[in-house]
Amino acid sequence: MYVVSTKQMLNNAQRGGYAVPAFNIHNLETMQVVVETAASMHAPVIIAGTPGTFTHAGTENLMALVSAMAKQYHHPLAIHLDHHTKFDDIAQKVRSGVRSVMIDASHLPFAQNISRVKEVVDFCHRFDVSVEAELGQLGGQEDDVQVNEADALYTNPVQAREFAEATGIDSLAVAIGTAHGMYASAPALDFSRLENIRQWVNLPLVLHGASGLSTKDIQQTIKLGICKINVATELKNAFSQALKNYLTEHPEATDPRDYLQSAKFAMRDVVSKVIADCGCEGRA
């Protein structure tokens, strides 16, 4: 069985001192590039999708594609619900075979966040599904959810321990200065806060908003306990820019099988770099 939970992936990463990249996919070509590149580098990867992606492609279609590609390449893959907020939506997708969930209730007050997350954990663990949750809020936009930078909150290390123990989550997404989207200038990550969180919480930690971070910053977060690195915008930008360039240079192009190749090549460069930055090549 090549479609797996993220729990063992992330526990292995925690023990091995590397991170597993989670790539948000948006179409068939994105998935092909992620899986083909990961298989060629023998690297564990997570196929992530926001609610918008699952609505666009269809849950059953995505599950079938991931399963087929995992078998084709004899490569373990996890399909992960990224930034899902509704219990009924999560439950339906779990019953369809999804084995990794992020319940995002980080916009709620602390006690309500715990209550919402624990409800999802109690349900998901009955199906051997791993659960990630977020404490603190990232700025930027994910799907149609916009968080102003002024409203973004960093993760409190002491609260993080209480949150982890009260909910029973399998991994914790932390807010240390990253944001969804690309950065106009290099962000100032709070490494001391991350180190403090690591001292209080013995779970695999997750970094959202990693698109555009430097190799140095990514590798420093891994040293301080990050076991999962989320990348979305960087893939979308590479795809769209390469496609625009190709169609500008070849205005006569009409066959998607031709003009999408340039976009796939551009995404392949992103995926291989992220895998290298995470230190997970050869770990699958």
Swiss-Prot record:
SUPFAM superfamilies: Aldolase
Keyword Zinc listed: yes
Pfam families from the UniProt entry: F_bP_aldolase
Active site, UniProt feature: 82
Cofactor note: Binds 1 zinc ion per subunit.
Keywords: Galactitol metabolism, Lyase, Metal-binding, Zinc
PROSITE patterns: ALDOLASE_CLASS_II_1, ALDOLASE_CLASS_II_2
Domain of life, per lineage: Bacteria
Pathway the protein contributes to: Carbohydrate metabolism; D-tagatose 6-phosphate degradation; D-glyceraldehyde 3-phosphate and glycerone phosphate from D-tagatose 6-phosphate: step 2/2
Gene Ontology biological-process annotations: D-tagatose 6-phosphate catabolic process; galactitol catabolic process
Subunit structure comment from the entry: Forms a complex with GatZ.
NCBIfam families noted in UniProt: cbbA, PRK09195.1, PRK12737.1, tag_bisphos_ald
Function according to Swiss-Prot or TrEMBL: Catalytic subunit of the tagatose-1,6-bisphosphate aldolase GatYZ, which catalyzes the reversible aldol condensation of dihydroxyacetone phosphate (DHAP or glycerone-phosphate) with glyceraldehyde 3-phosphate (G3P) to produce tagatose 1,6-bisphosphate (TBP). Requires GatZ subunit for full activity and stability. Is involved in the catabolism of galactitol.
Family note: Belongs to the class II fructose-bisphosphate aldolase family. TagBP aldolase GatY subfamily.
Listed name of the protein: D-tagatose-1,6-bisphosphate aldolase subunit GatY
Species the sequence originates in: Escherichia coli (strain SMS-3-5 / SECEC)
Lineage: Bacteria, Pseudomonadati, Pseudomonadota, Gammaproteobacteria, Enterobacterales
Gene name as annotated: gatY
